[in-house]
Structures are given as structure tokens and as C-alpha cells.
Amino acid sequence: MTYQDIHAARFLARPNRFIAQVELDGAVETVHVKNTGRCRELLLPSCTVYLEGSANPARKTRYDLVAVEKERPGLPPLLINMDAQAPNQVFREWMEAGLGEALGLPRPTLLRPETPWGRSRFDFYWERTGVSHETSVLRKGFVEVKGCTLEEDGLALFPDAPTQRGVKHLRELAACREAGYEAAVCVVVQMAGMTAFSPNDRTHPQFGSALREAARAGVRVLAVECAAAPDSLTITGPVPV
């Protein structure tokens, strides 16, 4: 996925979870933050952020904050995409290109977003029609996508805050598997260069427990990293889980 009209700015403050104040071309600008999560380890005073300009004259803010540079001692800054809508978009592009096959997710003949099942609404429902031994075979499954912006020393971690909704999704995915569907949770790591992914047990041990229980129930637990640039985000391949 790509962005248009990108500008570098200096982060100043975040008055609430929807907006931030930045310095752009020497002036203070209020911008929309495309991530309502805490992001406290990312949005630090004076850090470099990247904004996408909006052509909508009716908007209250002229820019969306979509990425940030994280300073690392002795290393170059790490560019992290923090657009909460991006993981689903790049996952869809990745699936439709057939690139999920290496991780057991087929190129779908049907890929439907925001599909309800049971008490949840999953990010994607997919079907794949094929032929085996001259017999038509229909595979079908659900995928829940989680965007990851937290890293510690090259380890990608999710979640960055407690998420009861995430726990519910994992339990529902296990129920999908029991009902005969294929099921997966895919963590889209919105940065490059990670050595592995792990559930953030320190922040939300219940999520880590639910993830392991789902895996034992047959839910695929996948993580993929991305090539992140100020104006683009693309899934590049798997990260060890």
C-alpha cells in the first residue's frame, strides 16, 4: 500500500488519543493520529513523524500521522508504520497475490472482509475452490489480523496494552476451528528487521494464554514483517513465532 503527499514533521504532544501536535515547516499543526492505541514508547517529544496530507477541505485536520522514527542507541532509527488501518490492507494485498501460501493460507477464490461468525466479527473470511483426485474441494476459513508496533531489542510484541477484545477473538477462532473451518491469527509487524514475535505476557498475560490455547486448538499463529517507508508499507515475509 502507498500513501500520497507525505511530509516529515517533529512530534510535540498528544492531547488525546485522536490528535497530536507537531511542528511542520516551522509552525505548530494539529494532526489526526491514525492509531488510537497508547503508542507511548513511540510518540516521544521531538521524534520524527510522517504525515499524509488530506485533500478533503471539510476535515478539521489537514494531515494524518501515519509513521514514526524510533531512536535506538547505537543503531539507525527504526521506521515504524503506526496506521491502524494499514495491517488489514497489506494483508489483503498479500493474500490476493497468493503470497500467504508459504504459511498455509491459500490464494483465495473469495476473500470477504469484516465477516460475522458467532459472537465476533473477523477481519477476513476466505474460500478456496480446488480439485483433488478429480473431486471439487472447498477450503474455507477465518483470519483475524493484528497490527504490531511494539518492539524491544528486535523482538516484536503484541499487544502494547490489555485487549479483552483480542482474547475474545482468539477464543472464537478456536470455536471456528472446532466447527470445521480453518482459522488463523496473523500479526502484521509494521516494521522491518525483527528477529521473532512473541505475545506480550508482561502487559497482558491473559492474551498470551489465549494465544497458546488457540494454537493448541488448531488455530494457526502467524507473524509477518513489513518493509516500511514513509510513503508505503508492504509485507515481505514471515517472522518466527
What positions do the PLM features span?
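Short nucleic-acid-contacting surface segments enriched for D/E, G, S/T with interspersed K/R
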Residues: 37-50, 174
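Active-site metal-binding core of divalent-cation-utilizing nuclease and nuclease-like domains
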Residues: 78-85, 90-96, 100-149, 168-171, ...
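Beta-strand/loop nucleic-acid-binding surfaces
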Residues: 27-41
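Nucleic-acid nuclease catalytic cores
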Residues: 154-167, 171-203, 225
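Domain-level recognition of nuclease-like catalytic cores that cleave nucleotide substrates
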Residues: 190-241
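Flexible glycine-rich surface loops and low-complexity tracts that mediate binding to linear polymers
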Residues: 45-57, 225-226
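OB-fold/S1-family single-stranded nucleic acid-binding modules
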Residues: 59-78, 235-236
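Short aromatic-glycine-enriched beta-strand elements
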Residues: 16-21
